[in-house]
Regions:
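Short, well-structured N-terminal submotif of metal-dependent ribonuclease cores
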Residues: 1-56
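Acidic, PIN/NYN-like endoribonuclease modules and their adjacent C-terminal/linker elements
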Residues: 1-4, 91, 95-121
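Acidic catalytic patch
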Residues: 56-78
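Donor nucleotide-sugar recognition loop
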Residues: 80-83
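Alpha-helix capping/helix-boundary segments
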Residues: 12-13, 34, 65, 89-90, ...
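A general structural signal for well-ordered alpha-helical segments in protein cores
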Residues: 35, 48, 66-69, 87
């Protein structure tokens, strides 16, 4: 089954920006957290933000994402397997929107697969 779109993690977004990766032929989204991580290192963050918003759908941190992240955080904490907060929010965005996540950090995000995360590629 072909994905109805994908959520792109910061690691892949950087590769796309550097010309090391091409966008797939399907709708591509980024989390607002990914947008922040990406533009904060740019010489002109305002211009980088505008360009990213022209190319990708930007998914905000809404109640659905925050609730999903909170539930997963408690489960990870109980097992002593917490991950970076930003990655948790990106993963929760992917899960709550039912979008596979394209990331270079598969080992890290694989902790979220049992919580409903699907990794792309």
């Amino acid at each position: 089954m072909k994905a109805r779109g994908i959520l792109i993690d910061t690691s892949v977004l950087i590769d796309i920006d550097r010309g090391k990766e091409d966008l797939p032929d399907l709708p591509c989204y980024i989390s607002i957290v990914t947008l922040y991580e990406f533009i904060r290192g740019k010489a002109d963050p305002i211009k980088a933000k505008a360009l990213a918003e022209d190319i990708f759908g930007v998914i905000p941190l809404d109640n659905k994402v925050i609730e999903e992240a909170s539930i997963i955080w408690r489960k990870l904490r109980s097992k002593g397997e917490l991950i970076d907060e930003r990655d948790l929010l990106i993963g929760a965005t992917s899960i709550s929107r039912m979008l596979p996540l394209w990331t270079r950090n598969k080992k890290h995000f694989s902790k979220l697969e049992e919580h409903g995360l699907t990794l792309w590629r």
